[in-house]
Amino acid sequence: MSFEKLQKELHEAIEGVNRYNPENVADLAACVQAMVNENKYDKDIVLTILKLYQLNPEKYDEAVVRQVLLKTLMVLPSSDFALAKCLIDTNRLGSQELRRIFDLGAVLESCNFAVFWKLVKGAYKPTTNPNEPFKVPGEVPKMIKPMVGFEDAVKHYACRVISVTFQKIEKKMLSRLLGGASDKEVTALAQSFGWEAKENGDVFFVANHEGTIKTRNIDEKIQFPHVADLLTSIQPPLTL
């Protein structure tokens, strides 16, 4: 069954008091799989199944949880990934595969796109630090490979970050932030975000952030009794 059909049926099934009916778990899991296969997303469904796993621990399926976490990473910079983590019981967090997703999430949330693309392309070299999060970096591309559209989602996320942090950016740097994207792909993404090509296309003008700053005046009304109390408290004592 397609994602659209599953989505429609589930939204009817989880409406009102039936939202956390444990009988919905199987259909919710099937819908999550459809999201993975068809590159779709529904926040309500992914958070509902995580809550049902909390309420019905005997139905817990880590494979589905991993899919949910990776899908929420695909909609950064929304807070869905953080919300999803909060709906996983602490006794489940020791899983090595879950930890790998959390570590990947930390890389993306910190906008460390250079590290992300090294991991994806097999160019990452783990450090000797005992706390090195990616001691087996080859597991990362295997983990995200089944997630249709994952790399494209990260590219769009990177462009959204660039839109609010850069005024202009060189095409070469933009290509690196997008994982070595071709000139054609870089130009297409730049156009989709409304960036203007400058200097024979070697630089993109992103936005004049200084020109869009909005000032805000905050007025606070102070009542006279408050002033009187303040003056009384600082008045020096009378000397006789």
From Swiss-Prot:
Q: Which UniProt keywords apply?
A: Cytoplasm, Initiation factor, Protein biosynthesis
- List the InterPro entries: ARM-type_fold, CSN8_PSD8_EIF3K, eIF3k, PCI_dom, Transl_init_fac_sub12_N_euk, WH-like_DNA-bd_sf, WH_DNA-bd_sf
| Short name of any one Pfam family annotated for the protein | CSN8_PSD8_EIF3K
**What GO terms in the biological process aspect are recorded for it?**
formation of cytoplasmic translation initiation complex; positive regulation of apoptotic process; regulation of translational initiation; translational initiation
Subcellular compartments: Cytoplasm
MF term (GO), any: RNA binding
Per the entry, what this protein does is: Component of the eukaryotic translation initiation factor 3 (eIF-3) complex, which is involved in protein synthesis of a specialized repertoire of mRNAs and, together with other initiation factors, stimulates binding of mRNA and methionyl-tRNAi to the 40S ribosome. The eIF-3 complex specifically targets and initiates translation of a subset of mRNAs involved in cell proliferation.
Q: What is this protein called?
A: Eukaryotic translation initiation factor 3 subunit K
Identify the gene encoding this protein.
eif-3.K
